[in-house]
């Protein structure tokens, strides 16, 4: 009676192996290249699966290190192309995969960029983004990966899902969004109305007391805490606070559900 079950099990294993592409030891390939840059260089980065790490440095070149990984063998690494194009002052990095849609290779991109290079956009399909000591009004987007920003000479907006967002040491922010992940941001200055939002997690916002803005902070099933900063409040409830810093030139809307909101002095 055991034979039919053995045959069925072997057939299931064969089917799984066919669908997954014969998963085996992870093949890797690491490559470092150096590129020229000027103070007028504007950079964009677009990746698939993996981490993107961009750090400013005092050199005069862009150093790009790529780490390719594939679970279906060394041959699949040839299907991963890191496209670098330079035209009209733009420096664009893009990961392109031409292999089977049944596999999910990954690429880690690590870039050292001169401090005066402007970082325009950084996008990633699945993975973290780290941005440190750079310049530019930068738009960051990914999913299933944290976004960590530290010391950027410019305004930053960040959007991800199922992961943490942290923005500190920037000129200002244009917004921060995630789901099922906490947010911690410093708001040094504003150039427009912004929203900061997540779900099922806490939001911590450090506010420059010199801001001119209306702060509207609310949560569904937790509480809003204001500490160390004075708001001219028009609404003061456990789950919803509306107050003004200076004049109401801009609006900061903060939202979460099933998580606390903390407003602190920067």
Which ranges hold each PLM region?
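Short coil-to-beta strand junction motifs in C2/discoidin
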Residues: 76-78, 210
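Short acidic/polar N-terminal linker immediately downstream of export determinants
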Residues: 7-9, 17-62, 67-75, 99-106, ...
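All-beta strand scaffolds that present successive hydrophobic residues in beta-strands
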Residues: 43, 119-122, 173, 193-196
